[in-house]
């Protein structure tokens, strides 16, 4: 079951973060952050694995150990060394997003997939 809205705790406030506003989720130093299409960055309180299970697979892809990316955020794909791919998103990212050679076919199939009827 995927969540439509995540409640994000920022200091003494709780901010409702809509799933469709998320461009990517990123983990570094055991902390997960979400970046919106407007470039806002929010601290999240679960692991990347937990969010992966809460986000619809059709709309979000686990690119690597650090990133889950939204389909709408992918603007360009570049072929990189060793048959890997790098993703360029609609928003800036803290580091290069690399898709491993082994995951390239899965990523391409995901990107080509037609949205299932709801």
Regions found by a protein language model. Name each.
Residues 1-11, 101-118:
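Eukaryotic intrinsically disordered, low-complexity regulatory linkers and tails enriched in Ser/Thr/Pro
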Residues 1-98:
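Conserved binding/recognition cores within well-folded domains
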């Amino acid at each position: 079951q995927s969540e439509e809205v995540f409640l994000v705790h920022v200091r003494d406030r709780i901010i409702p973060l809509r799933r469709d506003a998320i461009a990517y989720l990123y983990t570094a130093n055991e902390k997960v952050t979400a970046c919106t299409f407007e470039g806002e960055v929010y601290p999240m309180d679960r692991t990347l694995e937990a969010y992966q299970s809460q986000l619809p697979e059709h709309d979000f892809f686990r690119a690597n150990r650090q990133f889950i990316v939204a389909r709408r955020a992918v603007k360009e794909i570049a072929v990189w060394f060793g048959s890997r791919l790098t993703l360029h998103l609609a928003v800036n990212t803290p580091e290069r997003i690399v898709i491993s050679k082994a995951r390239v076919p899965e990523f391409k199939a995901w990107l080509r997939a037609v949205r299932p009827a709801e």
